[in-house]
Amino acid sequence: MNIRTLVALWKANVPHWVWIGSAAWIGAVLLGLDGRTPDWGHLALFIVTTLTIQSAAEFANSFTDRKEDRIYGPTNTLVTGELDARIAKKMLIAQNTVAALLLLALLLITLNYALIAVMLVGWFFGLAYSVPPLRLKETLHGPFSHAIAFALLPIAGWLIVEPSLIAQNGFIIAFAALLFLHSFGLGITLKFRKTLLALDSGLIHMEQGSSVYSIGTVGFRLSFKTAMHLEELTSLGAFILIPIFWYLGVFTAAISIALLALPLPLTAAAMILRMKDPIKNSSKYKAMMTLSWIFIVVILLGAGLATVVSPGYAVLACAVSLAGFPLLVRIVHPWGSKSLNGRY
């Protein structure tokens, strides 16, 4: 296997989403430790297993989307010809086999049944999102599977170091609920991207005299207007939880203020732009919604880092985490609809 194929495989594992998704479980690990020293062997095995599962889920999506990505994701290495589909299939099977073996080893070594159950559910939904016969991304359940897979990341990180989910006033359950709702909304946002690309490519059409709000969302089976309202309800609803959790003493003032000051304005601005002109502003509101989601998980990372290093170093590490995402996107998607400057 040559270097070109290895690089193509790495790109097909969508490293930018693995990178930024890792912030969720790293932050949870640090907060769950609460100043204690972890079992380094258990933690190391957990890290390798989690990264393998995350990568396998992303790779499965790249592989199963290779035909439709000629329109929706032309920088997919299975579309550009950098990666042969036969090699990709073998590697996908091998990667998931390794993930299963690692998960089994984690079970035998830690005997942490709650952790393994959470990781199994996350792995299942990560694969079921795109892999037939379920391929939930083409159903009404798509945003749910997208959201549950992401929301379980911090719970898994917590459970490797803290057996109780209600420790620290149930913080991790509360944060996972917030992340689930916003991830659900982001999942719908991604359906809008696909719908507008299909409209632009002539795969779907608006009836004469109708508007974009009346067309069906591709892969979601709801009208654009209905999906838009559901996106608003879940995305903005996530932030309604923050003052409640703050009042109940579940969230600290620092975390609450950070969540209200950074992700909330971006989410609100995205909603406003989409309502004004969903076609013209599509790339802007997609970018804002994505950045809002990223800020949520990076704030969790920052909160965790602040328990082991000074606030200044925690902020610096968060800045590196944020900068890493667009850098990796630029490498994986140098052009096309999924790039930073893509049409949608």
Where are these regions (language model features)?
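Intramembrane alpha-helical segments
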Residues: N2-K11, N76-I166
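Extended hydrophobic alpha-helices typical of membrane-associated regions
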Residues: I3-R4, A254-Y344
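Small-residue-rich segments of transmembrane alpha-helices in multi-pass membrane proteins
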Residues: I20-A28, F144-V161, Q208-G209, K286-L301
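Membrane-embedded alpha-helical segments that form the functional core of polytopic membrane enzymes
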Residues: G21-T64, A99-L104, Y113-L127, I166-T189
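Hydrophobic core segments of alpha-helical transmembrane domains in multi-pass membrane proteins
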Residues: L45-I47, L107, A114-F125, G170-F180, ...
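Acidic (Asp/Glu-rich) catalytic motifs at the cytosolic membrane interface
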Residues: T49-T80, A85-I87, L181-Y213
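Transmembrane alpha-helical segments that form the membrane-embedded catalytic/substrate-channel core
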Residues: L51-A60, W123-P133, A151-L152, A176-T195, ...
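Multi-pass membrane catalytic core of lipid/isoprenoid biosynthesis enzymes
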Residues: R70-L120, I204-A254, V297
